[in-house]
Amino acid sequence: MDALRAMWKGTISFGLVTIPVKLYAATESKDLRFNLLHEPCQTPVQYRKYCPTCEREVESGEIVKGYEFDRGRYVTLRDEDFESIPLAARRTLEIVAFVRLEEIDPIYFDKTYYLEPGEGGAKAYGLLRHAMEVTGRVAIARVVLRAKESLAALRVFREGVLAMETMHFPDEVRPVAALTGIAQPELRPQEIEMATGLIESLTMPFSPERFENTYREALLELIQAKIAGAPPAEPGPAPEQGRVVDLMEALRASIRAAEAQRAAGGATGGAAGADGTPPAPVARSPEAPARRAIPGLPGDPAASVPGVPAAPVPRAPGVTGAPTPGTPPAAVPGVPATAVPGTPGAPVPTAPGVPSAPAPGTSPTSVPGVQTAPNGAAPPGPFAGSDRAAEVGPDETAPGGP
């Protein structure tokens, strides 16, 4: 593991106690970077600092920062101007309050850092950490990083490490009043019950390791294939858009699909075991509420929504066990189906998105106005605006380019 490099050194001011600390970035971007090339010769394009008035390139020493206070009029500021601003917190994390973490809306959080005690600060660092653990509080502080003052929240992270989250000031958070499309529609009790049931069926302990950057992996595979000279892969078929049906049926189908997904390996389609068996679903958290019976699904004695047939829950491919009473077993690829006495031997119809034939007289369902998006697009990344080659993300266009 590569050693971390401290990006800031200072002190935590805790009353009359000062704690020397070092600051490290806690996260790093894994975005792939792409150079912009001149296609005929495959040479990286350069961006030069050019003054259109003087009609020449300018050196770095000739460049200053300017604030446009009127159209075309600037006031310039130099490094010594920024240094002259009286900020007591320039090299100090000044703790000004302690609050409970749940009182802070996550929208205020910006970037995360690790704090490590500096020379001679281990005991005071440990004392602050222990006191915060005992009281269940996080510290609110002021800090200046890169000539910008920020609010910050200090909290106990893990393995005895204090983490610092820089925070936005209130005037940096846009008001929700600017959103005009938020409505309060009337909801039927059955719809609420089905929606909460879908949430419960997808509830599991949070485990970051379950979630992978599938877009980045696919992009790396594409790059490796092009390096090896492999022909480009044919694009897959676009997902079919089912006809718009009742919201209740769409929710019911979503619950069936979620249950099948959990049985098949969870949120990310977990890898099979060494013997080829599918992974076991993640156990529910002890704090998670027990699932309630959902109208129209097995386990609820009440009748389903009038006019909407309730299909039995499908079994996930490769998962064995007794079928739901009164329903035929799901077809497993390569395994002959065993007929249940008194029932036909046809496979159980499944929800849209679960491979199987649809039930007679039904069509794939979708929620009005909701479209399925492909796996997340690569987030745009910054590019270097200097006289070296620009680096941009896959969907970015460099400003001021040729």
Swiss-Prot record:
<keyword id="KW-0234">DNA repair</keyword>
<keyword id="KW-0233">DNA recombination</keyword>
<comment type="function">
    <text>With LigD forms a non-homologous end joining (NHEJ) DNA repair enzyme, which repairs dsDNA breaks with reduced fidelity. Binds linear dsDNA with 5'- and 3'- overhangs but not closed circular dsDNA nor ssDNA. Recruits and stimulates the ligase activity of LigD.</text>
</comment>
<dbReference type="InterPro" id="IPR009187">
    <property type="entry name" value="Prok_Ku"/>
</dbReference>
<keyword id="KW-0227">DNA damage</keyword>
<dbReference type="GO" id="GO:0006310">
    <property type="term" value="P:DNA recombination"/>
</dbReference>
<feature type="domain" description="Ku">
    <location>
        <begin position="12"/>
        <end position="185"/>
    </location>
</feature>
<keyword id="KW-0238">DNA-binding</keyword>
<dbReference type="InterPro" id="IPR016194">
    <property type="entry name" value="SPOC-like_C_dom_sf"/>
</dbReference>
<feature type="compositionally biased region" description="Low complexity">
    <location>
        <begin position="299"/>
        <end position="308"/>
    </location>
</feature>
<feature type="compositionally biased region" description="Low complexity">
    <location>
        <begin position="332"/>
        <end position="343"/>
    </location>
</feature>
<dbReference type="InterPro" id="IPR006164">
    <property type="entry name" value="Ku70/Ku80_beta-barrel_dom"/>
</dbReference>
<feature type="compositionally biased region" description="Low complexity">
    <location>
        <begin position="359"/>
        <end position="376"/>
    </location>
</feature>
<feature type="region of interest" description="Disordered">
    <location>
        <begin position="261"/>
        <end position="402"/>
    </location>
</feature>
<feature type="compositionally biased region" description="Pro residues">
    <location>
        <begin position="344"/>
        <end position="358"/>
    </location>
</feature>
<dbReference type="Pfam" id="PF02735">
    <property type="entry name" value="Ku"/>
</dbReference>
<comment type="subunit">
    <text>Homodimer. Interacts with LigD.</text>
</comment>
<protein>
    <recommendedName>
        <fullName>Non-homologous end joining protein Ku</fullName>
    </recommendedName>
</protein>
<dbReference type="GO" id="GO:0006303">
    <property type="term" value="P:double-strand break repair via nonhomologous end joining"/>
</dbReference>
<dbReference type="GO" id="GO:0003690">
    <property type="term" value="F:double-stranded DNA binding"/>
</dbReference>
<comment type="similarity">
    <text>Belongs to the prokaryotic Ku family.</text>
</comment>
